[in-house]
């Protein structure tokens, strides 16, 4: 998907006068490639911690949304300060968006989400709720959780037994709520960046859309 997105982005950027847009997309592509490699390196790593998780997300989803926000205002002729503000905004909501994706992958219903759920577990990818649960578990509980994670990965998306048991534990331990609270905090940090925009319908729509990032169910 990223390859198709960036191919289309480069095609559009080639029609814009000046090279700033192409350079911005190119820089984002390099950052996202590094993020993908970092994620592959840590796939199946039960010791993955929150700082590394956030570094991966910042280099992937957040980098894509940040450059999109910055280029959007750049296309309107906005100066560098406004571009920087929207880039910071995009980076924050990009991380929040990914956190909500993590939550939906564990708690969502396929018919509502619109795609397969529990794909991360089947691929051996640890997401924020799982990472938080592992970090707060007692040693014996952590061992049991790791076995459930291995079973869920072995069962794949079609298997439910281990994934259901793991999901119940993660939810009851408060790790789903924890992940949502992190997303909420990021949105609260992102919203002030929109004050750099002139008051009007565009800013109002962005304020409204920001809430949808973590309230969405698909």
PLM feature spans:
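All-alpha prenyltransferase/terpene-synthase fold signal
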Residues: 1-218
């Amino acid at each position: 998907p990223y390859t198709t997105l960036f191919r289309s982005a480069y095609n559009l950027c080639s029609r814009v006068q000046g090279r700033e847009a192409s350079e911005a997309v190119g820089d984002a592509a390099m950052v996202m490639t590094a993020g993908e490699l970092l994620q592959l390196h840590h796939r199946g790593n039960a010791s993955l911690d929150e700082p590394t998780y956030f570094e991966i997300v910042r280099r992937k989803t957040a980098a894509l949304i940040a450059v999109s926000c910055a280029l959007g205002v750049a296309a309107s002729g906005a100066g560098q300060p406004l571009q920087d503000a929207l880039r910071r905004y995009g980076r924050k909501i990009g991380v929040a968006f990914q956190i909500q994706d993590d939550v939906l992958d564990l708690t969502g219903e396929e018919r509502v989400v619109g795609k397969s759920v529990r794909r991360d577990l089947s691929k051996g990818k640890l997401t924020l709720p799982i990472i938080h649960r592992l970090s707060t578990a007692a040693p014996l509980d952590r061992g049991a959780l790791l076995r459930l994670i291995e079973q869920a990965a072995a069962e794949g998306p079609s298997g439910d037994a281990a994934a259901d048991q793991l999901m119940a534990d993660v939810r009851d331990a408060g790790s789903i709520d924890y992940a949502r609270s992190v997303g909420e905090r990021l949105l609260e940090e992102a919203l002030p960046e929109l004050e750099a925009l002139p008051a009007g319908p565009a800013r109002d729509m962005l304020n409204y859309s920001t809430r949808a990032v973590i309230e969405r169910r698909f």
